[in-house]
Amino acid sequence: MVAQNNQQNKDETKGIKSYYCSKIEELEIKVNEKAQDLRRLEAQRNELNNRVRMLKEELQLLTNPGSHVAEVVKLMGKNKVLVKVNPEGKFVVDIDPTVDIAKLTPSTRAALKHESYTLHRILPNKIDPLVSLMKVEKIPDSTYDMVGGLDKQIKEIKEVIELPIKHPELFESLGIAQPKGVLLYGPPGTGKTLLARAVAHHTDCTFIRVSGSELVQKYIGEGSRMVRELFIMAREHAPSIIFMDEIDSIGSSRGESGSGGGDSEVQRTMLELLNQLDGFESTKNIKVLMCTNRIDILDPALLRPGRIDRKIEFPNPGDAGRLDILKIHSRKMNLTRGINLKKISDKMNGASGAELKAVCTEAGMYALRERRVHVSQEDFEMAVSKVMKKDSEQNMSINKLWK
């Protein structure tokens, strides 16, 4: 009887123990769930607090009065600076301790507090978007191997553009100033722009291309401002090459008397260009490359040494040059055997490089028209006759016009 009671007590104890163990496990699971919920809610609280803080900061910025934009004129001691605010005038203001005084150079844009006029921030230079678009992001893929018949011109442009950028110590050892600008002149289609792209490829520097007509603006002062911002951008991205194509559109000779407001604005743009050419040092790794077909109408002030240090002529190619250009442009063409490029070159006496390229393209068009995949000698001869023929309609007599 006693043994039976002991067994019954053991069973009851075991049952109670298992019951409490199961309850403890359930409570532990609930505690873990509550702890996870608590951590999630804490994370949400932190996120909301951060958002509230950001909104408060944004609200504070929105409620603060705006800053004045000023231009630094010069430093006036350790903690003072003379600035120019348009249209109010010039002021001597304090400098905030957080501002690096070494960066406060003349013509630097800065922000002044609305009430105290304390200089508290340095602003980036203001560049016209049209000027920023002149900067070529992708380096041109043209190389010197793609230029034919211009060995002398390549050598001269290497000496004044590529050599000072890559090896400035050579000029310092000789004690001579680096050339600033180069003028490429010659008939149309002789490879001036092509050689400029090749120079940009081999120097591996910032290439800024601008046409002279882009600097002729409608409103007074716009062209001069674009020229100033163009050179500012060139200084910021040095070493750089400024390539000005068709410079005769703004660099023509000045007459004794102005012939109109448009000509006066063009002359103001050219005067600003002359000022910028005189203003920057030749050691700043900024080279100016100008290109024109009409050197005879350029102003002598633009052509003088110190602004344009070298003038490189690009004549029409000679016999050997024409053959080299034909070989370059026909290098990737699918030609039949026995093509005599020398014979084709002899038929194009006086042709420019652009006309030689047009002959290769036109020969391919003749083969394409006849559904062939090879270009023959006859295709080249027909292309020469088409490209080099004279426009007889310009020399028609009056009798022929009235037939």
Curated annotation (Swiss-Prot):
GO biological process, one term: proteasome-mediated ubiquitin-dependent protein catabolic process
UniProt-annotated binding residues for ATP: 186-193
Key words, A-Z: ATP-binding, Cytoplasm, Nucleotide-binding, Nucleus, Proteasome
Subcellular location: Cytoplasm; Nucleus
PROSITE patterns for this protein: AAA (PS00674)
Gene3D superfamilies named among the record's database cross-references: 1.10.8.60, Nucleic acid-binding proteins, P-loop containing nucleotide triphosphate hydrolases
Domain of life: Eukaryota
Alphabetized GO MF terms: ATP binding; ATP hydrolysis activity; proteasome-activating activity
Family per record: Belongs to the AAA ATPase family.
Example of a GO cellular component annotation carried by this entry: proteasome regulatory particle
Pfam families xrefs: AAA, AAA_lid_3, Prot_ATP_ID_OB_C
InterPro entries tied to this protein: 26S_Proteasome_ATPase, AAA+_ATPase, AAA_lid_3, ATPase_AAA_core, ATPase_AAA_CS, NA-bd_OB-fold, P-loop_NTPase, Prot_ATP_ID_OB_2nd
Name of protein: 26S proteasome regulatory subunit 8
PANTHER family the record matches: 26S PROTEASOME REGULATORY SUBUNIT (PTHR23073)
Record's function text: The 26S proteasome is involved in the ATP-dependent degradation of ubiquitinated proteins. The regulatory (or ATPase) complex confers ATP dependency and substrate specificity to the 26S complex.
Signal peptide annotation: none
Keyword Acyltransferase: no
